[in-house]
A protein has these predicted regions:
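Nucleotide-activated donor-binding/catalytic signature segment of Leloir-type glycosyltransferases, i.e.
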Residues: 131-148
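Short, basic, glycine/proline-bearing loop/turn elements
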Residues: 89, 139, 156
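A donor-sugar binding/catalytic signature common to diverse glycosyltransferases
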Residues: 1, 149-191
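Generic beta-strand/beta-sheet core signal
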Residues: 78-80, 118-122, 146-148, 166-168, ...
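Conserved catalytic-core segment of nucleotide-activated headgroup transferases in glycan assembly
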Residues: 37-134
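Anion (oxyanion) recognition and catalysis
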Residues: 111, 139, 176
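Active-site-proximal region of nucleotide-activated glycan assembly enzymes
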Residues: 1-55
Length: 191
């Protein structure tokens, strides 16, 4: 019955209800959440938690993109699985433009920035129109694509970037945990 209304906003609301109604003391809830996020962000292999997919296994600690420019305002943009959520009405309402269109708009409207688009490691070996359209964004000035199989350290990228942009993925809340400014575009489970 809980999952009867399966929209993302409902899931976010249910998570908040569970959090608020739990008998666990608030300080313990925060301590548990902080511990989980700290392990997720700081355990580069993420092998200590069987519930976390091993997306960082190949990443080299503190490796940054070769194109990194200290003299620019650097934006780390983390792509979500558009093909999984793209047809959900709630997602369409909260994000009327695709991630590709959004990146195009940002890069054309704001000069003197570098955008580092991290394609999710889960999308490696996916020959999909969406992934290919993301790769094509490298033709734009100031847009740098980090391929799924790249050894660039995603969490270090978060730490050194000036701004994090997320399309509803957990990277948004992870970056907020690192005290980074975060712009989340579209709906998310952590609203």
């Amino acid at each position: 019955r809980i999952w009867e209304d399966k929209d993302i906003g409902n899931v976010a609301d249910l998570l908040k209800i569970f959090f608020d109604n739990s008998d666990t003391p608030l300080s313990e809830k925060y301590k548990t959440g902080e511990s989980w996020l700290s392990r997720r962000v700081h355990d580069s292999s993420q092998v200590s938690d069987v519930l976390i997919p091993k997306f960082t296994e190949r990443q080299v600690e503190k490796k940054i993109p070769n194109a990194w420019r200290e003299d620019q305002f650097n934006v780390a943009l983390f792509i979500s699985y558009e093909y999984e959520l793209g047809d959900i009405d709630e997602v369409k309402r909260s994000m009327p433009h695709s991630q590709v269109e959004t990146i195009n708009v940002i890069s054309s409207c704001i000069s003197n920035i570098e955008i580092y688009v991290r394609i999710h490691p889960h999308l490696e070996n996916v020959d999909h129109e969406f992934v290919n359209s993301i790769k094509e964004l490298s033709a734009l000035d100031g847009v740098n694509i980090i391929l799924p199989e790249s050894t660039v350290d995603s969490y270090y990228l978060m730490e050194i970037a000036d701004l994090i942009i997320s399309f509803g993925s957990t990277t948004g809340v992870e970056a907020a945990f690192l005290s980074k400014p975060v712009l989340t575009i579209g709906c998310s489970y952590y609203e």
